[in-house]
Design a protein with these regions (language model features):
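Structured, active/binding-site neighborhoods that engage oxygen-rich ligands
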Residues: 1-472, 496-499, 506-507, 514-532, ...
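Short proline/glycine- and polar residue-rich coil/turn motifs
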Residues: 55, 476-484, 493
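Low-complexity, Ser/Thr/Pro/Gly-rich disordered linker/stalk regions
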Residues: 375, 379-382, 527-588
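Short structured motifs
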Residues: 427-431, 470-474, 487, 574-579
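Beta-sandwich interaction modules
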Residues: 434, 486-494
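Trp-centered recognition loops
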Residues: 440, 446, 478-487, 586-588, ...
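Extracytoplasmic
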Residues: 475-482, 510-512, 560-561, 573, ...
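Secretory/extracellular carbohydrate-interaction modules
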Residues: 570-613
C-alpha cells in the first residue's frame, strides 16, 4: 500500500497526541476512578503545569526501540532479537528509561536481566520463562506506538512488527495488546470511523484471547448503553477491574478503559483523552496510547493548540544512554518514524522532505503545521511564537516571532541546546543530557526581519555559553522584508557548554518608541567539527535528588561516577560505561589524562578531555 500524501502531517499528529496523553495522565498515574472524582470532579485539561515535562517510560520505549530497524543487520529478516539489542543498547542498566521495580516484579526489568544473562528474545519475555502474571502486564502495549506509526494503512505489517517488539518483554495477552494497539494506529491513517478501527484491529489477534473478549464486551455494552461513559466504567469495574487480574498493572483493565474512551469520546480528540484520563488506573499509559490513535485519526487540526500543544512547545525529554538524544523535539521523532516508514515500504521519500529526513532531521525546519521545535523566548515584554505558512526560506512554512518592546531593547528567541536539573520540576525517569551543539561548530539560521511602522527590526544570530553566561554575537541584519541566510562559527577551544542558539531581535527608532518587532525564522541547524575542552575541576555535580546525581554532559550505562577534583571518577564491581558528545559524530579525536587503580577491581579517573573531528 502506497504511503499517502498526508502521511507526514498525520505521523506528527500521532506522535504529538502520544506526548499530550502522557503529560495529561502522568500527574494522576495510578489513581483510581473514585479518587480522581473526589479530588478533581472532572478533568478537562492538564492537571499540572511544568517548567518542562521530564522523561517518561511511555515515550522512551517508542522512540528508542524503533531504532532496531536502523541498527539491524538485515531489515528483511527483522526479528525480536533486533528489538532486544535495541533495549540493551539504549536503556541504562537499572536506572532511568522505565520502571526498575525488581526481578519478578517489573516485567521490563525482568526481561532486561534475562537478556543480560543470555536468555534470548522472545524467550526473555515469555510466559514460559516468567509466568503469565509477569508476561501479561501493561508494558506490551504502552511502548508499541511507533510500530503502528511506521506502518500507515498497513495493519499486517504493524501486527508483525509489534509481535516481534512486544515479545521481547511480554507474552500472551501482553503481546496481543501490543499487536492490537499498533494495528489501531495503522488503521487510523486510512479509516473514517473509530468503531471501524476498533473492530478491524481485532482481526490480528486470536478471537478467543482475553484481550479480544474485553474489547468486544465493552463495544457490546456501548451499543446497548451509548449515553453515559460512567455507566460503562461501572460495568468495567465490576467485570474487568484490577481485582480480577493478578500483578501490579495488568493489561486487560487498562485496555477496557481505552476502548471505553474511544467509543464514548465521539471521535473528538479532547473528549476521548479526557474520558480515558478520568477512568484512572495507568493513566499516562492509557491516555498516551489513545492519544496516538486519536492524533492520527483527527490530524493536527483536531488537536486543540492552545489547550494541548502550546504548553508542550514541541519539547521532549528522554533518558536513554545516548545523551545527545535526550533533549529532542516532537518533529524529530515524527521524522524518524517517517524515514523508517518509507524504508519499510520501499518508497522514495517525497522531495519536500528528502533533505530533512536524510540530512537535517535534528534541524528546526517548521514544516509540520503548528510545530515550534521548542523555540523559546526571553524579553522585557510580551512575546509571541507562531508557526505559519505566510513565508518560508525553504519548504512551505516558517516560525513568526513577535516581541512587544521599547526602542533599543533586545528580545532573545532561541533553541535551548543543553538542559540540567534546574530546568525541571522533578526527576521522573532520571534524565541526563549532553549539549546539542559545541564550540568549533557552525550555526546556520535564515531570518526575515520585518520593517515595522514605528520601529525597524534588526536581527542578530547568537549563541550562549551556559557555564559562563557569555553571549557570543554574530552577523546583524536590518529589517527589509527579505530573507537573510546567516551563519556563525562558534569559537573553538572553549570550556563550558553551549546552552542557547538563536536570534536577537531589537527595535530601532529615532527616539523613544514602543511597539512590535517581528521576524520570520527558518532552517536553524548546526554543522562542522567540534573543538572544545571538558575541565572537570570547573564542574559541579548536577543534583536532581539524593538518588539522582549526574556528571554534567555525560550519560551513564552502569557504574559509580563522581567528580573528584580535576578528574571524573568511574568505578564498578563488574563493568561501567559513560558517554558524552553527539551521536552523529564520526572520525574524531579525543585527548585525555587517565589514572587507573585496579588493586580492588576496576577504577578509572578521566581528566580534562578535548576533542575535535
Amino acid at each position: 500500500m502506497k504511503i499517502t500524501e498526508n502521511y507526514m502531517e498525520k505521523v506528527y499528529a500521532g506522535w504529538l497526541g502520544k506526548i499530550v496523553g502522557i503529560r495529561l495522565g502522568a500527574p494522576i498515574e495510578g489513581w483510581t476512578y473514585q479518587r480522581i472524582r473526589d479530588v478533581f470532579g472532572e478533568v478537562w485539561s492538564y492537571p499540572v503545569d511544568y517548567k518542562n515535562f521530564a522523561a517518561d517510560d511511555d515515550s522512551n520505549g517508542p522512540l528508542f526501540f524503533i531504532r532496531a530497524l536502523e541498527d539491524c543487520e538485515d531489515l528483511n529478516n527483522f526479528s525480536s532479537k533486533d528489538v532486544a539489542n535495541a533495549l540493551l543498547n539504549y536503556a541504562p542498566y537499572e536506572h532511568g528509561f522505565f520502571w526498575w521495580g525488581g526481578y519478578g516484579v517489573s516485567t521490563e526489568h525482568t526481561a532486561y536481566l534475562n537478556l543480560r544473562n543470555g536468555i534470548p528474545a522472545p524467550r526473555s519475555g515469555s510466559i514460559e520463562q516468567n509466568g503469565a502474571t509477569m508476561a501479561e502486564q501493561i508494558g506490551g502495549q504502552i511502548f508499541i506506538d511507533s510500530w503502528g506509526l511506521v506502518s500507515p494503512g498497513n495493519p499486517e505489517q504493524a501486527a508483525k512488527l509489534a509481535e516481534q517488539a512486544a515479545g521481547v518483554t511480554h507474552g500472551g495477552n501482553g503481546v496481543y495488546g501490543g499487536i492490537y494497539v499498533a494495528c489501531c494506529i495503522s488503521l487510523a491513517f486510512e479509516e473514517k470511523s473509530i468503531r471501524d478501527i476498533l473492530e478491524k484491529a481485532l482481526q490480528y489477534i486470536p478471537d478467543d484471547c482475553e484481550y479480544a473478549r474485553v474489547v468486544k464486551a465493552v463495544m457490546k455494552f456501548h451499543d446497548e448503553h451509548p449515553e453515559n461513559w460512567r455507566d460503562c466504567f461501572d460495568y468495567i469495574f465490576e467485570n474487568f477491574g484490577y481485582d480480577k487480574y493478578p500483578g501490579t498493572c495488568h493489561i486487560i483493565p487498562n485496555a477496557a478503559v481505552m476502548i471505553l474512551a474511544m467509543l464514548y469520546g465521539h471521535e473528538d480528540f479532547s473528549d476521548t483523552i479526557n474520558i480515558c484520563n478520568m477512568c484512572g488506573w495507568d493513566t499516562d499509559c492509557n491516555v498516551g496510547n489513545v492519544g496516538t490513535i486519536m492524533g492520527v485519526f483527527a490530524g493536527i487540526d483536531g488537536i486543540d493548540y492552545d489547550k494541548w500543544v502550546k504548553p508542550i512547545n514541541d519539547f521532549l525529554a528522554c533518558s536513554n544512554v545516548v545523551p545527545s538524544l535526550n533533549a529532542v523535539d516532537i518533529p524529530f521523532g515524527a521524522s524518524y518514524f517517517a524515514k523508517m516508514a518509507y524504508a519499510l515500504a520501499g518508497e522514495e521519500i517525497p522531495e519536500k522532505w528528502n533533505t530533512i529526513l536524510n540530512e537535517r532531521m535534528d534541524s528546526c525546519h517548521f514544516e509540520y503545521p503548528t510545530s515550534t521545535h521548542a523555540i523559546r523566548s526571553c524579553s522585557p515584554g510580551d512575546c509571541h511564537i507562531r508557526n505559519t505558512d505566510e513565508q518560508a526560506y525553504t519548504g512551505e512554512r516558517s516560525l513568526k516571532l513577535t516581541a512587544v518592546t521599547a526602542s533599543g531593547e533586545e528580545s532573545f528567541f532561541y533553541k535551548q541546546t543543553y538542559y540540567s536539573s534546574e530546568d525541571f520540576d522533578d526527576s521522573r525517569y532520571d534524565p541526563f543530557f549532553a549539549p546539542l551543539v559545541y564550540p568549533g561548530q557552525t550555526v546556520h539560521l535564515s531570518v526575515m526581519p520585518l520593517p515595522g511602522e514605528e520601529m525597524a527590526t534588526t536581527a542578530q544570530i547568537y549563541v550562549k555559553n551556559g557555564a559562563t553566561g557569555e553571549i557570543i554575537r554574530g552577523e546583524k541584519v536590518k529589517g527589509d522584508g527579505e530573507w537573510h541566510a546567516l551563519s556563525m562559527k562558534i569559537p573553538g577551544g572553549q570550556t563550558g557548554h553551549i546552552s542557547e542558539v538563536g536570534v536577537i531581535l531589537c527595535g530601532v527608532a529615532k527616539g523613544f518608541a514602543m511597539g512590535d518587532v517581528s521576524a520570520y525564522i527558518d532552517d536553524l541547524y548546526f554543522d562542522g567539527n567540534p573543538d572544545y575542552r571538558l575541565e572537570f575541576g570547573r564542574m559541579q555535580p548536577d543534583s536532581w535528588h539524593v538518588t539522582h546525581q549526574e556528571v554534567p554532559q555525560f550519560a551513564k550505562l552502569k557504574g559509580h561516577s563522581y567528580l573528584d577534583g580535576q578528574y571524573l571518577s568511574l568505578s564498578c564491581a563488574d563493568f561501567a560505561e559513560m558517554y558524552t558528545g553527539h551521536h552523529l559524530w564520526n572520525n574524531y579525536r579525543v585527548t585525555a589524562g587517565f589514572k587507573t587503580c585496579n588493586r580492588y577491581g576496576a577504577f578509572c579517573e578521566y581528566s580534562s578531555a578535548g576533542g575535535h573531528a
